[in-house]
Amino acid sequence: MSNNSSKSFCLLGFPLILILLLSFLLFSSFPNNESPPQQFFSSLTMSSLLVHTNALQSSSSSSSLYSPPITVKRRSNLEKREEELRKARAAIRRAVRFKNCTSNEEVITYIPTGQIYRNSFAFHQSHIEMMKTFKVWSYKEGEQPLVHDGPVNDIYGIEGQFIDELSYVMGGPSGRFRASRPEEAHAFFLPFSVANIVHYVYQPITSPADFNRARLHRIFNDYVDVVAHKHPFWNQSNGADHFMVSCHDWAPDVPDSKPEFFKNFMRGLCNANTSEGFRRNIDFSIPEINIPKRKLKPPFMGQNPENRTILAFFAGRAHGYIREVLFSHWKGKDKDVQVYDHLTKGQNYHELIGHSKFCLCPSGYEVASPREVEAIYSGCVPVVISDNYSLPFNDVLDWSKFSVEIPVDKIPDIKKILQEIPHDKYLRMYRNVMKVRRHFVVNRPAQPFDVIHMILHSVWLRRLNIRLPS
């Protein structure tokens, strides 16, 4: 009898001890004897655990076997977008850590390498993730010419080119960035043109009173009010995932009437002056490009380094105090540093740039100037002379490797500064200028790593730095 009892105890006791041991191990793995949090398990595992527990505890009760199914909450569109961005951030971190990029072959058209990039691995992987993931919704509200249209030539041309590309061309077969519906978008584009507003609403300007920005503020505020009331997206982020792009001098003033309301709003500006409210962590600088009519870029007339006989060159009007200082020291005074307020008959602007080693890029009335891009197009090393100018694409491009920055108070020393640059360093800078050109070229339709994609990448980087609450 005792032997049978011992056997019975062993048969029953061993499973009981095993269950107690497993229970102890499971619950002791969580601090303070708390039950494991439900989010620790996937929804599938949690449902399975609950069903089996009910069956074991109340096998005689039919109601426990047919308890209402557990509903799994579907992720919202915003949660899906945030998860996509989280994966992109993780991929970029891995690329930086392991100095290696992962990509689908279809998006490999160019591999960023070399000194011109602050971190080539981060930039390459970021561009890959942008090509795979990034979706932008261009609002449909509003009518031309103030919205969905803009100048496509001259110094404001990049404004209209970008609006046209994002609103129309990118909706075709190559439109990988254009969201098919707003719920898919990671960022939202306000496609109004400051240049067109000034042209159609303000012209002709006949008195100082005509420069008042009140009408510009009213048009912009009304447009944002319309999209904010019609769609949930502005209020969802307080405007942090919304952006505009403009090269007009008045563009920085757009949100001035409601600074608190627009404090998170991203502005892509040519006039990226940090002393006039440009915020590097929110706004982004875009290049001012003088786009010729019926063309996308000027003719290339650049010479090899050995054929560049002019040390430094500038030609332009005396707009602003910086150029006045430049003219007072160098206009018509030196054969090596050639500075003109106008060119005489027979002189070709692009040919002179093509024969120059360094191209002077002084700010005009505003900090931005098309001179930097003109220099880059021609293989001439830009010499940036400005105060408080945040250079285009400075997040990813290291301008010190392909340009020279000279403070305004050093203008009298321009020749000395440039002559002291060793020849081998100049040659490296020249090669870097030739390499960085692709990032300032306008293509239609846009191509990977060109200027339109670089503008989008500036938006993408800032969107990656925003985590919206779900």
Swiss-Prot record:
Compartment list: Golgi apparatus membrane
Cytoplasmic-side segments: 1-7
The organism's place on the tree of life at top rank: Eukaryota
GO molecular function: glycosyltransferase activity
Keywords, sorted A to Z: Cell wall biogenesis/degradation, Glycoprotein, Glycosyltransferase, Golgi apparatus, Membrane, Signal-anchor, Transferase, Transmembrane, Transmembrane helix
GO cellular component: Golgi membrane
Role played: May be involved in cell wall biosynthesis.
Family: Belongs to the glycosyltransferase 47 family.
Protein name: Probable glycosyltransferase At3g42180
Organism: Arabidopsis thaliana
